[in-house]
Each structure stands twice: as structure tokens, then as C-alpha cells.
Design a protein with these regions (language model features):
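C-terminal charged capping/lid subdomain of soluble metabolic enzymes
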Residues: 308-396
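ATP/NTP phosphate-donor binding region
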Residues: 1-92, 346
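Glycine/serine-rich anion-binding loops at beta->alpha junctions
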Residues: 90-106, 138-144, 276-279
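Short Gly/Thr/Asp-enriched flexible loops that form oxyanion-binding sites at enzyme active sites
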Residues: 51-52, 81-82, 101-114, 146-147
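A glycine/threonine-rich phosphate-anchoring loop and its flanking beta-alpha core
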Residues: 113-209, 303-307, 311
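Short alpha-helical scaffolding segments that buttress acidic/His motifs in well-ordered protein cores
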Residues: 196-200, 241-252, 289, 333, ...
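Active-site segments that bind and position negatively charged phosphate/pyrophosphate groups
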Residues: 202, 206-331
Length: 396
């Protein structure tokens, strides 16, 4: 196990109807003038936004709204939010929604006190200060409610980049599983897929002797298989949604990623898909992850994939041919994704195989490699996209 520091200061408020306490927590963490960031009309139609605004008013907090956040959140609304915060002298940002809303709120939060372009922080500069952010979560998926990360798409360049710093961890997050019951089944399935991706990307490591976090990660994956099936059968199953919501936070606040090398190639490969084709992030991951796993199994990564197959998917270990076990586990994962309605091919997300050379270039690999478990050069990216497209894998 590697040396590590771990800092996770977010205060979590979990359970039914806990969003009614939001105003109290905003005040507790120093807010007096609040920007409420949300997505589309669902927050208004459901009455959630009105309830949030009412509880802020009960605490004598000044609040203004900024709606219109879209999936794969764009830079344009971030600039708009920064200007609004400065005009209104905002001192606290409240995100009401899922990961896209929270990531937008975080980007605004680091942009307000900064004299330059907020995109600097999505191009390598590390933020050192931010307005405080709180969240009311409505979609279990990204884990942004407990993470130090934000992902934004630059509308001009179509770059989909991330910023990371402890100042981006929310002060508090309200998690009411009942708020996710109105989600379309497809969106719920995309969230399940994203949660599993965050778990896998910590699981696939070359760091030895990390049994505690191995077992924690395997436990989350097993729970997602079970609860994912339960919520697909009964979308109003509160307990299934509660477990999924908590898994989304736990798998991405990095308590299960400490002391070990991680591999984020699946997300890296997917980001250009959702940036170019505007597909749901979870859908893109469902297409990319099995292809990435298959590539790893064929290029020296079969041992841990076989462990996953046995411990998570219940496959029998073939000690004479671990790769066979690994491939069996990958097929079991694909079958699960299909069972919850996820796409598995380029065609199903509207991606064109003819664009693969462009997708590879969008990843800005150069002559280097990405990832940790199995390093991927430009040819490897090309091969994985072709596997995801159902093509053979010719050389570039």
C-alpha cells in the first residue's frame, strides 16, 4: 500500500425529506446571499425548487436562481454564473440537481474570486480558493456531492476537462433517495453505470497488498449488481435507491481509492464521446468500459480482471488460462449493462466509427501514454475505440 493523505470534510445529510433542512445548513456554513443553480424544468415541475427557495427564505437568506444546466455541462453557463455572483455579491452557491449541476456550481465557485479565466483551472492550474458550495442531490451517479472534482465542456474547443482541489469539496450535501424516484429508467441506469465506472477505475491497479480497499470496491460492485436489478424491477424501491445513492458518494469521495494506483482511462476515452456526440456520460461509459477491459485482458492485464470475474461476477477461476476467466467476467459485465438497458456499441450512442482518428486526436496523447493499470498509447486508444465500434483493430 502506498502512503496517502485523505481529507473529506463534507457534511452529509441523508434520508427522506431532509432537503427541508437546507436553509439551516446554508446558514451554518456561512451563507447569507445564495446562488441556487439547477438544471431544467424538472426541479420546478416537481416542486423541489420552490421548497428549497422557501426554506432559504425561512432562514432569512437572500437567494437568486440560475437554471439551464445541461448534461455534459458547458462553459457558457459558468461564465454567466460568475458574472451573476459578482453583481449580486453572492457568498454561497447551492446546487440542486445531479453531477452536471454540481460541477457547474463548483466551476462558478472557483471562478468568482479569480481574476483570470476560470478555464485556467480546467487546463492544469490548481485552484486555491472558492466560494462555499452545498448540494441537494437529485441523481445518483457522478459522486460530485462528495468529491473534489468538477468536469466542464468548453463550448468553443469541445474539450471536456476536469479541475480538482480540496476547496471544491462541498461543505454539505443533502441526499434524499426519494428525490431520484421520478428519474426516467434510462437515466437511473446511466447513473448506475457511472458509479460502477468510478469503482472499477480504482479497482484496476498494480499496487500490491491493498486487500481492504479491494474488498470495499468489490462490495460496492456486488451491491450495484443487486440494487441495480432491484431498482429496474421496481423504480419506487426506496431502499434500492438509498443504497445506490450512498454508493455513488462512497465510490467517488476516494475513501476506497487511497493508497493505491488508479486507472482513469475509461473516463478519459469516454469524455471525447460525450463532448462530440452529446451522449449521456453513463451511456458512453457502457460502450467504452467493456472494450477497455477486453484490450487489457489481451495485453497483460488478465490477472486482476480474472479476480473481478471470480469475486464480483461469480465466475469459476481457470488457473490454466486466467485470460479465459477474465473474458468470461467481461461478458458477464456486458450482460448486466444490457439487462439495465445500456448501449454497448458506437451505433447505439450515435457515434460514427469514421470519426475514430479524430477522437484519438481529441485525447491529446502525443507520444505519451495514459492510465496506470495498462498504459495506453495512441495506437491503444485507436484499438479500444475500434473494439467499442465493433470493428477489427487495424494499425493507425
Amino acid at each position: 500500500m502506498r502512503n496517502f493523505d485523505f481529507y473529506s470534510p463534507t457534511y452529509f445529510v441523508f434520508g427522506k425529506d431532509r432537503e427541508a433542512e437546507t436553509g439551516r445548513y446554508v446558514k451554518r456554513f456561512g451563507g447569507s446571499r445564495v446562488l441556487v443553480v439547477y438544471g431544467g424544468q424538472s426541479a420546478k415541475r416537481s416542486g423541489l425548487l420552490d421548497r428549497i427557495m422557501a426554506c432559504l427564505k425561512e432562514e432569512n437568506l437572500y437567494a437568486v436562481e440560475l437554471g439551464g444546466v445541461k448534461p455534459n455541462p458547458r462553459s457558457g453557463l459558468v461564465y454567466e454564473g460568475i458574472d451573476l455572483c459578482r453583481r449580486e455579491k453572492i457568498d454561497f452557491i447551492l446546487a440542486v440537481g445531479g453531477g452536471s449541476v454540481i460541477d457547474t456550481a463548483k466551476a462558478i465557485a472557483i471562478g468568482v474570486p479569480y481574476d483570470g479565466d476560470f478555464w485556467d483551472f480546467f487546463s492544469g492550474k490548481v485552484p486555491e480558493q472558492a466560494l462555499p458550495v452545498g448540494t441537494v442531490l437529485t441523481i445518483a451517479a457522478s459522486g460530485s456531492e462528495g468529491s473534489p472534482d468538477s468536469i466542464i465542456t468548453n463550448e468553443k474547443t469541445l474539450e471536456k476537462n476536469g479541475a480538482e482541489a480540496d476547496c471544491l469539496r462541498p461543505c454539505f450535501s443533502v441526499l434524499d433517495p426519494a428525490l431520484t424516484e421520478s428519474l426516467p429508467t434510462y437515466q437511473t441506469a446511466c447513473g448506475i453505470t457511472d458509479i460502477m465506472a468510478h469503482t472499477f477505475e480504482r479497482y484496476f491497479t498494480n499496487t500490491p497488498d491493498v486487500e481492504v480497499t479491494d474488498r470495499m470496491l468489490e462490495g460496492v460492485l456486488l451491491a450495484m449488481l443487486h440494487e441495480g436489478r432491484r431498482v429496474m424491477e421496481d423504480p419506487h424501491n426506496y431502499e434500492a435507491r438509498a443504497n445506490i445513492m450512498w454508493a455513488g458518494m462512497v465510490c467517488h469521495n476516494d475513501i476506497m481509492g487511497v493508497g493505491r494506483q488508479q486507472d482513469w482511462n475509461s473516463h478519459h476515452l469516454e469524455h471525447v464521446l460525450s463532448a462530440k456526440y452529446d451522449c449521456a456520460h453513463g451511456a458512453g461509459l457502457a460502450v467504452i468500459m467493456p472494450a477497455w477491459m477486453h484490450y487489457c485482458a489481451e495485453h497483460g492485464g488478465e490477472k486482476r480482471l480474472a479476480q473481478m470475474a471470480v469475486r464480483v461476477f461469480g465466475c469459476q477461476m481457470d488457473f490454466d488460462d486466467p485470460k479465459r476467466t477474465a473474458l468470461e467476467g467481461i461478458e458477464a459485465f456486458r450482460a448486466f449493462l444490457r439487462s439495465i438497458g445500456m448501449p454497448l456499441t458506437f451505433a447505439e450512442i450515435g457515434a460514427d466509427p469514421a470519426d475514430i482518428p479524430e477522437l484519438v486526436e481529441m485525447n491529446h496523447i502525443g507520444d505519451g501514454k495514459t492510465g496506470g493499470y495498462i498504459g495506453l498509447d495512441k495506437q491503444a486508444h485507436f484499438d479500444i475505440y475500434n473494439l467499442a465500434a465493433g470493428n477489427c483493430v487495424p494499425e493507425i
